[in-house]
Amino acid sequence: MSLKKCIVKQQKIFFDFLRFCIGSVKEIPDSLKEADWKELYAIAQKQALLGVLFYGIRRLPKELAPEQKLLMHWMAMAEMIRKQNIKLFQDSVKVCLNFENEGFANCILKGQGNALLYPDPYMRTPGDIDIYLSGGRKKIMKYVDRVCPNQVMRYHHVDFPVMKTAIEVHFTPSYMFCPIHNRRMQKWFEEVMGEQCKHRASLPDGYGKIHVPQVSFNVIYILSHLYRHIFTEGIGLRQLLDYYYVVCDFCKVYQISSNHLENFSNPSVSLSKGSSTFSPSPSSSGSGDVAGDAIALPEFWYRKRSLCPKGLAMIAYATELRLFVRCYTALVGSGAYVRCYSIYDDYYFYRR
């Protein structure tokens, strides 16, 4: 077998096992018998998914697990990720309380809020702390300049280096490149962020409470964030996995299951939860997979809330989500590994 075929084979085994790790499939994949665990470790390390795969390894019989030396090393890395998460949870509580005491309503974006959606909140590889502050750009920058002078302000955030953990203070959660779409998005943020700053979540093992967005917000925000990153820094599987668990949480909160998907075509169906109303429609893919079909829901959210004149979708048309659906299918679908590096084959950026 050629080297290229071996690599592709191990990539497919990786995705088979990843689906098992995240619970998308319940049975241990047969392909795991041919796994090159060193190659799977390398892929997981590159994609920041070592903790996620170790969560699955713990449920494997001994004969399918990696050899002892690699297993012990993997275990050590998973323990390091667990300790990093503990540190981020503790720092998130401190940061939230500090800004509250300074008079800023706040909300932790992505990061440790997403970690709470995972089966084990310590299995996600953590990053920095992204925190939204209310009050407006001028008020926030006045405070930041007083505490940490000479910080470079970007459009939507500014660095706030007051502790070892990196902190980004956001004036707005995100933005879009197209000025028209960005204006609509910022208007929506102004309407809903006050509600997000009131939504508290308890951290595991009594580490405290932080403000995190509601799932009805995240299902739009995280997708729009990924959509923008495709054209800038790129996206990895950790980001896709974050959105997978957001969609799973969305389906759980709104009590969506495969049996209810046929109701999506009925515009009179209303799903209400957490002061939000959602009237979705089936995705064009028609996959029958709950999480996969829910990929199409953010576009309908905007349309039903009349944020886009004449029914234009704020984030993108369904065709503009095609690339993301292809990436996402690699996680939740039954097909083989989907390459997602070429983004211009059937894509028209800002074509409207």
Predicted regions and their residues:
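Conserved NTP-donor binding/palm subdomain of two-metal-ion nucleotidyltransferases/polymerases, i.e.
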Residues: 2-127, 132-275, 286-352
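Ser/Thr/Pro/Gly-rich low-complexity, intrinsically disordered segments
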Residues: 280-282
